[in-house]
């Protein structure tokens, strides 16, 4: 119906922007309209340029053009209003991975899907300086990741400032690829066959690939802290994600996993004392995570399995 008025249905907003589902009378399909906020919805004063909407549009275009990993179809982007429109992937066909994890469905196949997706992006862009220059958004990387995760955490733990500075240096002195920047389980949609769609590319930029891996691992460990009696399933999920990613990175994989392992305690500490602490953590879990992360930052282990076993012991008897 060409002259039908569009209907905007408000969707639950994220902390970084507003969302609407757009439908047209007489049309079965629908679309999602996104608009970023400069002031993120967190208790602290967290401001980030809304130019990141253009980065997300570029990310979606790049993924589709290069067939690196499935993403929602980009319908359009308006650089003036920063409105971005993508095709809506509706339930019951698609589910956020985070919702499946919360329901107790810890499927290593889903972890493998995310690991492979990130690995394909990293391996497929590391030798393309022209593409990486288009994603040279160091200011956004600083405002979205470095400051909230490392700088603010260092301010809360001045005795660990040196260790956190070393983690930041490792992010700056290694290989560069295109990174997603926010590989949260809520940003992976899964269908019944296990096919995944990677969402929310507004944090994408030229950066260190081990940051993506460590972020993905940290989200699983934080979910593990909420379901500690499923330790075996969580261990398998984190290992599967890591191994799937490593297989895509060839000779660089092992060294990057070691870097991710050294960064991981910093990200866990940021979930407690960074700019936007994880609201789902109880006081006891915050205390356990803080103690664990502080100790591991000083030890700086580079063996992922060793760190996971220590995490299991630290979280094992939380009710």
Predicted stretch roles:
Residues 9-33, 166-211:
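Active-site acidic catalytic loop and adjacent metal/ATP-binding pocket
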Residues 40-41, 93, 188, 206-208, ...:
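Conserved protein kinase catalytic core
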Residues 87, 120-170, 240:
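Active-site catalytic-loop/activation-segment of kinase and kinase-like phosphoryl-transfer enzymes
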Residues 248-259:
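Acidic, serine/threonine- and proline-rich low-complexity regulatory regions
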